[in-house]
């Protein structure tokens, strides 16, 4: 029978000093036999997805205490990728994932916490906490801050839903007036919560449901809706129950590595492919699997991408569908339900809230449940009032979207496409693979051949795209030395993809990079090219004007030069000595913190995880 970890610091005569300190935090005599639950919050006023979390940690803490536990809250850092985008601030985004994971480990292990509730929301916070949960393998429940309501603008054609990507595209479009840009800017992000489309934050919060580590509704219930409070209340009670089951009943099935097994990772990736989730989820699932010693790899993602259809399309893949619409159609449990009926997921797996995923679907899939309370839950609607306050409205739709032929969520027979929403491509410039969000690629350019336009920084590419005539239809914008080591930090290329759209080139050009893309990116945007240029990848050998061939249906990407020519170029590169595999003219200040990250990080094909074996003494 496992012992409560907290007893290391709460029991025994020699722990009198530690108990004295615990007492100074408010603990009483009767508390020292209770499970100590870490409430891992991520409140910050920098990030709209986190501005409303300040009081939610204490909400969970009070519920933990009601259930018989002792709650102790702390915060992690949280970077807003949208605010950090387009400048050197983005160098810090992906590295912050590792810092978040480490900070959770440090706090939980230093204080011997028995279990934890992870209150996350935005892009790197959920992955960082997920990595920590898999690393620590103590009972854990995830509850996110929830998506923001979609912005709305009134046009001559009627009301249109918008988000920050629309504002960015409008701002770079010379045909849009300053006044209209102002309207878009003021309307794009109306409430607290993670950005309203199927961007990275919402994708990851949806995947925690598929992994079995979060309550149903976690990925789709709006941050502003009163229904979301129930998730926080239930999480507080659930985590105490899970802790007791593990420490008092020796039930290891509740642990993260038991719940988030290989099959659960397959479920999560299947969901991601079916809903056209962010390509960043590939990085994060690989990293979380690595922490939990789950043998889930790019090869598994490639295998799944060839058999899973697209059942749901959300902004940025389509213009007018956002997370609030997915929720009305039954949320993530409805998508999982359709995947189950198609024989595409495993349902014999445990979750933190149900004995099996099959049991969870019986209760929460709106197409099979008879529960009126579940139907009411998924009718939660946006309030339409700008606010930074959680649970501030309780509006409901009159009905659910149960149309599986033409609705927001489709059944397998009426899929948007039989080919999945993400694909892994391989070829002579991506021997270890690269990722494309096929759900956001127009059918006319699934096969594309063009001339390489070489840039060794995102900034240089942006300057060229915005300069009239420098980038033409048919070009392949190739941005390199922006990978995990080369950046360092693997910047998101949201501005280049958005500006290509602004210039009317969104369906006429491709963008290929060893960096990554925002969940808000769409178009023929191919990222995570591995090995990256800074690691000696062949993307570093492509020359201006080379022909790049992209064939998504056949999963191929290559530069149309012979192996002999590539070998000659490689020899010439290696002959440069210390200057080899480095950008020629880029001037970028790289801090010691980022240098340390670059020294230890690995390829995007491995999730850009840290590898301490790189250390040389």
UniProtKB/Swiss-Prot annotation:
<keyword id="KW-0456">Lyase</keyword>
<feature type="binding site">
    <location>
        <position position="492"/>
    </location>
    <ligand>
        <name>Mg(2+)</name>
    </ligand>
</feature>
<dbReference type="InterPro" id="IPR020558">
    <property type="entry name" value="DiOHA_6PGluconate_deHydtase_CS"/>
</dbReference>
<dbReference type="Pfam" id="PF24877">
    <property type="entry name" value="ILV_EDD_C"/>
</dbReference>
<dbReference type="GO" id="GO:0009099">
    <property type="term" value="P:L-valine biosynthetic process"/>
</dbReference>
<keyword id="KW-0001">2Fe-2S</keyword>
<dbReference type="InterPro" id="IPR042096">
    <property type="entry name" value="Dihydro-acid_dehy_C"/>
</dbReference>
<keyword id="KW-0028">Amino-acid biosynthesis</keyword>
<feature type="binding site">
    <location>
        <position position="123"/>
    </location>
    <ligand>
        <name>Mg(2+)</name>
    </ligand>
</feature>
<comment type="pathway">
    <text>Amino-acid biosynthesis; L-isoleucine biosynthesis; L-isoleucine from 2-oxobutanoate: step 3/4.</text>
</comment>
<feature type="binding site" description="via carbamate group">
    <location>
        <position position="124"/>
    </location>
    <ligand>
        <name>Mg(2+)</name>
    </ligand>
</feature>
<dbReference type="GO" id="GO:0000287">
    <property type="term" value="F:magnesium ion binding"/>
</dbReference>
<dbReference type="GO" id="GO:0009097">
    <property type="term" value="P:isoleucine biosynthetic process"/>
</dbReference>
<comment type="function">
    <text>Functions in the biosynthesis of branched-chain amino acids. Catalyzes the dehydration of (2R,3R)-2,3-dihydroxy-3-methylpentanoate (2,3-dihydroxy-3-methylvalerate) into 2-oxo-3-methylpentanoate (2-oxo-3-methylvalerate) and of (2R)-2,3-dihydroxy-3-methylbutanoate (2,3-dihydroxyisovalerate) into 2-oxo-3-methylbutanoate (2-oxoisovalerate), the penultimate precursor to L-isoleucine and L-valine, respectively.</text>
</comment>
<feature type="binding site">
    <location>
        <position position="81"/>
    </location>
    <ligand>
        <name>Mg(2+)</name>
    </ligand>
</feature>
<protein>
    <recommendedName>
        <fullName>Dihydroxy-acid dehydratase</fullName>
        <ecNumber>4.2.1.9</ecNumber>
    </recommendedName>
</protein>
<dbReference type="GO" id="GO:0005829">
    <property type="term" value="C:cytosol"/>
</dbReference>
<dbReference type="InterPro" id="IPR000581">
    <property type="entry name" value="ILV_EDD_N"/>
</dbReference>
<keyword id="KW-0408">Iron</keyword>
<keyword id="KW-0411">Iron-sulfur</keyword>
<dbReference type="GO" id="GO:0051537">
    <property type="term" value="F:2 iron, 2 sulfur cluster binding"/>
</dbReference>
<feature type="modified residue" description="N6-carboxylysine">
    <location>
        <position position="124"/>
    </location>
</feature>
<comment type="similarity">
    <text>Belongs to the IlvD/Edd family.</text>
</comment>
<feature type="binding site">
    <location>
        <position position="195"/>
    </location>
    <ligand>
        <name>[2Fe-2S] cluster</name>
    </ligand>
</feature>
<feature type="binding site">
    <location>
        <position position="122"/>
    </location>
    <ligand>
        <name>[2Fe-2S] cluster</name>
    </ligand>
</feature>
<dbReference type="InterPro" id="IPR056740">
    <property type="entry name" value="ILV_EDD_C"/>
</dbReference>
<feature type="active site" description="Proton acceptor">
    <location>
        <position position="518"/>
    </location>
</feature>
<dbReference type="InterPro" id="IPR004404">
    <property type="entry name" value="DihydroxyA_deHydtase"/>
</dbReference>
<keyword id="KW-0460">Magnesium</keyword>
<keyword id="KW-0100">Branched-chain amino acid biosynthesis</keyword>
<dbReference type="GO" id="GO:0004160">
    <property type="term" value="F:dihydroxy-acid dehydratase activity"/>
</dbReference>
<keyword id="KW-0479">Metal-binding</keyword>
<comment type="pathway">
    <text>Amino-acid biosynthesis; L-valine biosynthesis; L-valine from pyruvate: step 3/4.</text>
</comment>
<dbReference type="InterPro" id="IPR037237">
    <property type="entry name" value="IlvD/EDD_N"/>
</dbReference>
<comment type="subunit">
    <text>Homodimer.</text>
</comment>
<dbReference type="Pfam" id="PF00920">
    <property type="entry name" value="ILVD_EDD_N"/>
</dbReference>
């Amino acid at each position: 029978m496992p012992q409560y970890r907290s007893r290391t610091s709460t029991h025994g005569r020699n722990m009198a000093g530690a108990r004295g300190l615990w007492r100074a935090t408010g603990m009483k005599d009767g508390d020292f036999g209770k499970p100590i639950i870490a409430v891992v919050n991520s409140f910050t006023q920098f990030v709209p997805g986190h501005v409303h979390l300040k009081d939610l940690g204490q909400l969970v803490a009070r519920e933990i205490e009601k259930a018989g536990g002792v709650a102790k809250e702390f915060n992690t850092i949280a970077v807003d990728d949208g605010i950090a985008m387009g400048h050197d601030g983005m160098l810090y985004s992906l590295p912050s994932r590792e810092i978040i994971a480490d900070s959770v480990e440090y706090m939980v292990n230093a204080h011997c916490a028995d279990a934890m509730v992870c209150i996350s929301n935005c892009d790197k916070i959920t992955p960082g906490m997920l990595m920590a949960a898999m690393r620590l393998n103590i009972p854990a429940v995830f509850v996110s801050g929830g998506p923001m309501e979609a912005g709305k603008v009134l046009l001559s054609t009627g009301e249109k839903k918008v988000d920050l990507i629309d504002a960015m595209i409008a701002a770079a479009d010379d045909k849009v007036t300053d006044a209209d840009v102002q309207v878009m800017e003021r309307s794009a992000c109306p409430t607290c919560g993670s950005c309203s489309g199927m961007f990275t934050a919402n994708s990851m919060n949806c995947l925690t449901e598929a992994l079995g580590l979060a309550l149903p509704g976690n990925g789709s219930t709006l941050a502003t809706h009163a229904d979301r409070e129930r998730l926080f209340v239930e999480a507080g009670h659930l985590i105490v129950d899970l802790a007791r089951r593990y420490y008092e009943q020796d039930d290891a099935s509740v642990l993260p590595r038991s719940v988030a097994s290989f099959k659960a990772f397959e479920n999560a990736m299947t969901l991601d492919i079916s809903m056209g989730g962010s390509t960043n989820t590939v990085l994060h699932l690989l990293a979380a699997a690595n922490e939990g010693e789950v043998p889930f790899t790019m090869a598994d993602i490639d295998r799944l991408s060839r058999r899973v259809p697209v059942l749901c399309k959300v902004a940025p893949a389509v213009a007018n569908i956002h997370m609030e619409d997915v929720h009305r159609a039954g949320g993530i449990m409805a998508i999982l339900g359709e995947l189950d009926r198609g024989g595409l997921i495993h349902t014999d797996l445990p979750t933190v809230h149900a004995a099996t995923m099959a049991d969870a679907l019986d209760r929460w899939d709106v197409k099979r449940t008879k529960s009126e309370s579940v139907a009411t839950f998924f009718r939660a609607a946006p309030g339409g009032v700008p606010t930074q306050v959680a649970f501030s409205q309780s509006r409901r739709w009159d009905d659910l979207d149960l149309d599986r032929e033409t609705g927001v969520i489709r059944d397998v027979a009426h899929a948007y496409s039989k080919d999945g929403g993400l694909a892994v491509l391989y070829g002579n410039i991506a021997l270890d693979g690269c990722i494309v969000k096929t759900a956001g690629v127009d059918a006319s350019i699934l096969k594309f051949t063009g001339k390489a336009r070489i840039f060794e920084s995102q900034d240089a590419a942006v300057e060229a795209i915005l300069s009239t005539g420098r980038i033409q239809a048919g070009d392949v914008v190739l941005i390199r030395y922006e990978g995990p080591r080369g950046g360092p930090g693997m910047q998101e290329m949201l501005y280049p993809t958005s500006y290509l759209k602004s210039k009317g080139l969104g369906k006429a050009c491709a963008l290929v990079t060893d960096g990554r893309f925002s969940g808000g990116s769409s178009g023929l945007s191919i990222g995570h090219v591995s090995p990256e240029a800074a690691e000696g990848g062949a993307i570093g050998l492509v020359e201006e004007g080379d022909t790049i061939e992209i064939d998504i249906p056949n999963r191929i990407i290559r530069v149309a030069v012979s192996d002999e020519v590539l070998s000659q170029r490689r020899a010439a590169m290696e002959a440069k000595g210390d200057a080899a595999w480095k950008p020629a003219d880029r001037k970028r200040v790289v801090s010691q913190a980022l240098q340390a990250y670059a020294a230890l990080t690995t390829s995007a094909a491995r999730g850009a995880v840290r590898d301490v074996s790189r250390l040389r003494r």
